[in-house]
């Protein structure tokens, strides 16, 4: 099902959405943070999706517990390190870990730039111990408004040499992309690539805006593109990558069922699309799960899954030489 001759990548993976249950438990007790359960076993349902529960509100509450225990910068560094370990242990050859330093900092009033430094340090430490290639993507969390995103941008740009791209995430309906055009001009001026969560809660116009005004060359989720034939044609022609996360889309009620997921529609239209985990800690999945779902529920053939793997390598924010090195390591 997964072709071992092709690099396995995960490009849409939130570092702050992948905190281990035992880490939440340990950090909560270490810092005297009240947790919603009195044992490690009973904590899991509060921080991970159980069964077929599908609600955006419930999903976000679980996500909040993951950042709620980041009481100091050592905790941030630990979580970053464990993200590298988890990526390697799931069999990934390459992952792009994205994170929102404002969101990670807000509960315990940590310095935003300090959070960025701690993430970088944790990833560096992880790379010494695990054989996986990692790049970082900074997130501007639109839900907190323009001023907060400016603070976030400043903290991220102070360490731009450790980033490959910037992302816009959060409340797509309440905070449309045009509010952040100036922010992303600065991102482009810093020579960073751009991806954006768009077409998830809002319609195709949100995707057009992200591409034409923010400068996005990849789109996170993008499920609503299928209602706009001109956009689908544009995506295919210009090789705009769709970072698809089927299980997450089900868990957040972005789609009602796997049967209604538009992954197949994108593939049939010739759109560049790959498989990703989104918030693997909340969804309690790994990349292997997404490939199993793609075969069993989305009805992709092994040949199509191999193409999805190749798409991921093409979409990655990598130099041509790094891309070739990923393939060379599989020989």
Swiss-Prot record:
Annotated Pfam families: A_deaminase
Family indicated by similarity: Belongs to the metallo-dependent hydrolases superfamily. Adenosine and AMP deaminases family. Adenosine deaminase subfamily.
InterPro entries reported for this sequence: A_deaminase, A_deaminase_dom, Ado/ade_deaminase, Metal_Hydrolase
Residues of the site described as Important for catalytic activity: 221
GO (cellular component) term, any one: cytosol
Positions of substrate binding: 14, 16, 170, 279
Gene Ontology MF annotations: 2'-deoxyadenosine deaminase activity; adenosine deaminase activity; zinc ion binding
Function in brief: Catalyzes the hydrolytic deamination of adenosine and 2-deoxyadenosine.
EC number: 3.5.4.4
A single BP term in Gene Ontology: inosine biosynthetic process
Cofactor note: Binds 1 zinc ion per subunit.
Residues reported in the UniProt entry to bind Zn(2+): 12, 14, 197, 278
Originating organism: Shewanella baltica (strain OS223)
The entry's keywords: Hydrolase, Metal-binding, Nucleotide metabolism, Zinc
Reactions listed under catalytic activity: adenosine + H2O + H(+) = inosine + NH4(+); 2'-deoxyadenosine + H2O + H(+) = 2'-deoxyinosine + NH4(+)
Keyword field contains Hydrolase: yes
Record protein name field: Adenosine deaminase
UniProt key word Metal-binding: yes
Active site per the UniProt annotation: 200
Cofactor: Zn(2+)
């Amino acid at each position: 099902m997964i072709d071992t001759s092709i690099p396995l990548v995960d490009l849409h993976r939130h570092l702050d959405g992948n905190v281990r249950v035992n880490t939440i438990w340990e950090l909560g007790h270490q810092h005297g943070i009240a947790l919603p359960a009195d044992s490690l076993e009973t904590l899991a349902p509060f921080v991970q999706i159980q069964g077929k529960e599908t609600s955006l509100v419930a999903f976000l509450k679980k996500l909040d517990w993951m950042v709620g225990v980041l009481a100091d910068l050592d905790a941030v560094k630990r979580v970053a390190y464990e993200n590298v370990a988890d990526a390697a242990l799931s069999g990934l050859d390459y992952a792009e870990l994205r994170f929102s330093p404002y969101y990670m900092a807000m509960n315990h009033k940590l310095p935003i730039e300090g959070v960025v430094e701690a993430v970088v340090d944790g990833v560096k430490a992880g790379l010494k111990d695990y054989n996986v290639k990692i790049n970082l993507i900074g997130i501007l969390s639109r839900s907190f408004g323009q001023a907060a995103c400016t603070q976030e941008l400043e903290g991220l740009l102070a360490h731009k040499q450790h980033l490959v791209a910037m992302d816009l995430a959060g409340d797509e309906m309440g905070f449309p992309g045009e509010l952040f055009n100036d922010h992303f001009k600065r991102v482009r001026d810093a020579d960073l690539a751009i991806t954006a969560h768009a077409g998830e809660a809002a319609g195709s116009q949100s995707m057009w805006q992200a591409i034409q005004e923010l400068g996005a060359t990849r789109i996170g989720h993008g499920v609503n593109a299928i209602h706009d034939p001109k956009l689908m044609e544009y995506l295919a022609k210009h090789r705009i990558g769709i970072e698809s996360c089927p299980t997450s889309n089900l868990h957040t009620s972005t789609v009602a069922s796997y049967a209604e997921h538009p992954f197949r529609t994108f593939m049939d239209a010739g759109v560049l699309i790959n498989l990703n985990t989104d918030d693997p800690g909340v969804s309690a999945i790994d990349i292997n799960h997404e490939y199993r779902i793609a075969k069993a529920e989305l009805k992709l053939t092994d040949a199509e899954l191999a193409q999805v793997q190749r798409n991921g390598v093409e979409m990655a924010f990598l130099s041509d030489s790094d891309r070739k090195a990923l393939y060379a390591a599989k020989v």
